[in-house]
From Swiss-Prot:
A Pfam family assignment: Latarcin
Function according to Swiss-Prot or TrEMBL: Insecticidal, cytolytic and antimicrobial peptide. Forms voltage-dependent, ion-permeable channels in membranes. At high concentration causes cell membrane lysis.
Record's protein name: M-zodatoxin-Lt8j
A biological-process GO annotation: killing of cells of another organism
Keywords: Antibiotic, Antimicrobial, Cytolysis, Hemolysis, Secreted, Signal, Toxin
Subcellular compartments: Secreted
Expressed in which tissues: Expressed by the venom gland.
UniProt similarity note: Belongs to the cationic peptide 06 (cytoinsectotoxin) family.
Organism the protein comes from: Lachesana tarabaevi
One Gene Ontology cellular component: extracellular region
Annotated signal sequence range: 1-20
Amino acid sequence: MKYFVVALALVAAFACIAESKPAESEHELAEVEEENELADLEDAVWLEHLADLSDLEEARGFFGNTWKKIKGKTDKIMLKKAVKIMVKKEGISKEEAQAKVDAMSKKQIRLYLLKHYGKKALQKASEKL
């Protein structure tokens, strides 16, 4: 329970940090107006908002690329695990198992692994009882 509370507190803290914006003074907005020849204060706020968005896009791009790399590596690991399990479970050669796994979609591979490890976990739990 305390892990849940700590996780909830961290999420709330990050949400507050993400929502907080630096204080904008009228002087800073006037400088932006002069630089961009803006007549309206709302246009200056809009330009500052666009400047903040570029930073967010850079961060989103970094985390998006990192996520894609992690996902690619886990997909490769799942393929290898599925082949090993098929070889051991069905007693077929590695090439035959690889051909079967290649014919399966990613979703089917995930389901196959979940079934295998789910049965394994259920057996271990029943042994403990």
